[in-house]
Amino acid sequence: MKQSGINGVKTLTLVVCAALASQAYAAVNYESANYIGSQPEGSVRFIIKYKDKSQSQQMMTNRSTTSVMNNNNITIAGFNAQFVRTMTIGAGIFAVPDLKTTKEAHLVMDTIASNPDVEYVEVDRWLRPFAAPNDPFYNDQWHYYSEYGVKADKVWDRGITGKGVTVAVVDTGIVNHPDLNANVIPGSGYDFIQEAEIAQDGDGRDSNPADAGDWHSNWACGKYPDPRYEKRNSSWHGSHVAGTIAAVTNNRIGVSGVAYDAKIVPVRVLGRCGGYNSDINEGMYWAAGGHIDGVPDNKHPAQVINMSLGGPGVCGSTEQTLINRATQLGATIIVAAGNDNIDAYGVTPASCDNILTVGATTSNGTRAYFSNHGSVVDISAPGAGITSTVDSGARYPSGPSYSLMDGTSMATPHVAGVAALVISAANSVNKEMTPAQVRDVLVRTVSSFNGTPDRRIGAGIVDADAAVNAVLDGNVVERPIDELKPQAEYRNPQIKLIRDYQMMFSEIKVNGRPGNTKFAVVKADIRHTDPSQLKLRLVSPKGYEYAVHYDNIKNKSSELITFPRDEQMNGYWRLKIVDTKRGVTGYTRGWSVAF
């Protein structure tokens, strides 16, 4: 396709509209379109990522082209579409306000994907906070000091309080509150909500991360008669989360924070009805210190990022890419599992890799009835009856207050706060910790549930005292693969088809290895047109799952996995492969496990 003589409108058509005769189809995340019926009417948008070095990608990243796009409408599969903006990863966002059904979304996605320049297309999903207000305020923070709390009080007694650590709260923003203000870095934060109607503060993206309120009227956020979309007052959700992490302590008022000397950077990504995945993930990446065009760089990059939010659907390419980049910048990302009592594998970003996914427990040490569960949940924390900082206004900010809330949203900041304590403890003895080390020590030092949970919600309850002890004792070193020498390797050479948008397992039976192991080395040889759409897990004989990170270039994986618990060696070990998008298939040429 030549560019010469193409005016603004034709250039836009070249970038978006498909060459229908082409057979080189891109990865289409059909699953991301399954839930558009639960979004506010007229809110459907698509994220389109073009292949690197393609003509379309070059035009997408060209500022003059995108400025032309912004002033023109186009048609895709008969639907009017408007260019919104270009993301930091080079993907374009397009709004299709008249689209209403999953079938229509699939038609649009197929049309886009038939362009040979397209790498993938997915819906810009709508995510929401994972909490709901409960009972009136009472000053009883059992979740810090009781048998099934996080045992933060024992760490405070040793002077470990989160000092020197920055935590980003990616949420609804934050309110003016005497129990928060001193721990919010002055002038920090940003409002990433682009749509003024969602932001409810009169404008789009700006440097003011204040929570303007997320109230909404009946059925503004979804269809009648779903009770989830009845009118609701503002939640002040981000302030409640921030208070659990780092409320000012020993000030004779209100509540305490888990890491009460840590500092908060508020990142506003949720407003009326929630927020777009694209805004949320760029806000998360910015919080870690990543650059976003048009936004001043964050002068206070966070070592810990709290994301008490989510929505239906498995982790997509866009969020996983930005999570990986944020992790590479040194941020430990803590995410809520969700509150629908379902398998969190079907929730995003809870199902992403390189994060810690958090379930919720009660004061009795049992699984909270609402907590999502499953193999992607890594750890749990108190999430029922949690008191923290909010505003007293029903719709708009009117003054400081306190409230009791339930949710995995409330459990997640407990883990984020303990992560800050762990990093602070490492700093106190001149140690540096990677995000992988922080995640490992948190999971490896958990306290026990009260009995076996009715559904799997991770290794146990986060334990600040045990985690900090592990750091101070030096028990956090990531051991290189050559220091852990497996005694034997077990192989399955079978060729197995990886079917389109399905799950497959390949088994290895281990005999003659009594005892337990703390690690395994996994090797896999997988051939696939688009390996980025695959999720790999090693499943132990006990049924615990561990992420296997896949080499997209060489189509092979060789990875050391350390376990947070002893795993028996004898029994059936399985490699689980999930194809998360439609359009292409592949196969495995065998795999092995060694310990």
UniProtKB/Swiss-Prot annotation:
One of its GO terms (molecular function) is serine-type endopeptidase activity. Residues 22-130 form a propeptide. It is found in: Secreted. It comes from the Bacteria. It holds the Pfam family P_proprotein. Keywords: Hydrolase, Protease, Secreted, Serine protease, Signal, Zymogen. Transmembrane segments: none annotated. It is an enzyme of class 3 (hydrolase). Its EC number is 3.4.21.-. GO terms for cellular component: extracellular region. One of its GO terms (biological process) is proteolysis. Residues 484-595 form the P/Homo B domain. The keyword Zinc does not apply. The active site is at 171 (charge relay system), 237 (charge relay system), 409 (charge relay system). Residues 141-468 form the Peptidase S8 domain. Belongs to the peptidase S8 family. This is Extracellular subtilisin-like protease. It comes from Dichelobacter nodosus.
